[in-house]
Amino acid sequence: MIVLDASVVVELLTNGALAASIRRDLAARSDSLIVPHLLDVEVVSAIRRLLAGARIDAHRCAQLLAGLAALPAERYPHTPLLERIWDLRHNFTAYDAAYIALAEATGAALYTCDEKMRGGHHATVVVFRA
């Protein structure tokens, strides 16, 4: 299994600079994809920022939202992870800790574009960067 965080999903949806590398890696592994329910809200927030910054238009927003809805990842509730999310509070935001806690609980690798997600926990982290 692979946990995708919001940075990776935004890269994939927007076909960002790292999207091809992420797709190649995912295709080579053929693992199932999992995400905390939080992912959808975080990605919608990122899409909103892209629109507010005039980097995309309303039509593109609709396309990205449809792509998010179609993301072939199983959504996991974060309620069972709350204790671990809290334990990680000294090094991570609750948002980041939700992805880490899910990866730890399932033994999945965590895919991210955020270097700060490395270390301070027991999850395996794969960081994509330019």
Label the predicted regions.
Residues 1, 100-130:
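Acidic, PIN/NYN-like endoribonuclease modules and their adjacent C-terminal/linker elements
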Residues 71-113:
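Active-site neighborhoods of divalent-metal-dependent phosphate/nucleic-acid chemistry enzymes
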